[in-house]
Amino acid sequence: MIMKYVLAIDIGASSGRHIVGWMENGEIRTKEVYRFPNAITDQNGHLVWDTESLVSHVKKGILEAQMAYPVESMAVDTWGVDYVLMKGDKEVLPVYAYRDSRTEAAIPEVHGIIPFSELYRRTGIQFQPFNSIYQLYADKLAGRLEGVTDFLMMPEYLLYKLCGVKAKEYTNATTMGMVNAETGEIDAEIVSRLGLPQQLFPKLSRPGTVIGQYEGIKIALCATHDTGSAVEGIPMEGDDLYISSGTWSLLGVKTPKPLTDENSQAANYSNEGGVGYIRYQKNIMGMWLINELRRELCHEKNFGEIVKEAEKSTFDMTLDVDGPEFIAPKSMKAVFDAALKVPLTKADYFRCAYLSLAQSYRKAIEELEANTGKTYDKLYIVGGGAKNTFLNRLTREATGKKVIALPIEATAIGNLKIQLEGLENEQI
């Protein structure tokens, strides 16, 4: 049997990686061939992405992969909601990042035209101030849509820079808050009522679709939203809970159909696109909390040291860390201080953060079980946070679930799995 090699380009908010994968003895084997930093930068008071750097690193990593393996296909996944506006083949700069505050004025205007209760019934997507629907309306208010011929979600933009084909992939499109939950396509009435250009919203493509090639390598669509690929990469046995633990914690379960009822809306649950299923999940606070505290309090310490000190602390107060004040504060320490109003050691801040994350998970699971009418026994945790044994223990204690922590590159594995299955079925 001839070995088939595929390349996953998996890019998160703080780093990207190129991972080659192949099937061996019924299991996906992987080898990381390139890793690079990524970061939101401040430009004239706005938070933006350096897309030129991203494209450069993507191409460098592909070259490294080609030098080491006979790669047949590749796919890109990134975070959701962010996009690049295009005028023909030219980018409209800057490319704003989801943490920027530019949507503040757009949100009430959007909800004045389409109440959120109606948006939720149509799309099933939880309210987040950075959802693409609000970003696009902010662009409309700012006049940035004039002359725009297209917009590409971040992974599709990177693929366009490789092969010249403009695509819109289903799982990532659902993060926009504009895909109809029942039809799986862009809701034309939402587009019309908001006065957005209809030509920007063509039919969506599904994971497994080949859209072009680059340097002799087929370019395929995986679940281009990283969480969509991550859920594909979790070896769940059945109806199990999952947390994709990174900058954000994505907690959810697979469902055959969307749940867009009032209880799901009240709990702010999302119905995001999966590979043949719906990801009924909630976007809640994650390692962003820890990373920001570390940057401010003890950037010289590694996470292992921080965890050990947090375990020794006896601090037991918790915070609701899913409040808007935690999204992009100038000082995370100041947010904690304002809420707790007691003196803390550095270790206390981190213990409070870990305890609060575990309680956030507990609350989200209670809501999920009430809304689905099911009780779940197992909780799979993947992503960077899965390596944190202290947080895993706190999560087990808070939720009462059997926690199965898999410190694997679940997103890359899911990306690779979609490609390998496509090659096996001769769809790629």
Could you describe each region identified by the protein language model?
Residues 1-93, 121, 147, 216-219, ...:
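N-terminal glycine/serine-rich phosphate-binding loop of ATP-dependent small-molecule kinases
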Residues 7-8, 111-123, 137-149, 153, ...:
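Active-site core segments that coordinate phosphate-bearing ligands/cofactors
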Residues 16-21, 82-86, 177, 229-233, ...:
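Short beta-strand scaffold segments in enzyme catalytic cores
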Residues 53-66, 183-189, 360-365:
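Short, well-ordered amphipathic alpha-helical segments that serve as non-catalytic structural scaffolds
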Residues 60-73, 129-141, 146-159:
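Conserved phosphate-binding loops in N-terminal lobes of ATP-dependent enzymes
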Residues 63-98, 123-130, 159-180, 205-206:
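Short beta-strand-loop/turn "lid" adjacent to the catalytic site in phosphate-handling enzymes
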Residues 70-78, 371-384:
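Short glycine-rich phosphate-binding loop at a beta-alpha junction
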